[in-house]
Amino acid sequence: NNLSDFIFGLIRAIGLILLGFGIVQVGLSLKSHDPSQRANGFLTLAGGVIITFAKEILNLITG
């Protein structure tokens, strides 16, 4: 159980890093008016949210 909590903690940290990176990408794309960078930023942002809440999503799926 401790190992599982540790692994999910690491996964959450990676998700938060991706989430922050996605926010920065979206902000930079709005400044430079770059639609492709904006799309990549939103995809990174969405991936970061999914990875951050992976444990909760798995608990919802498995019940």
Label every model-predicted segment.
Residues 1-63:
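Hydrophobic alpha-helical segments involved in membrane association or supramolecular assembly
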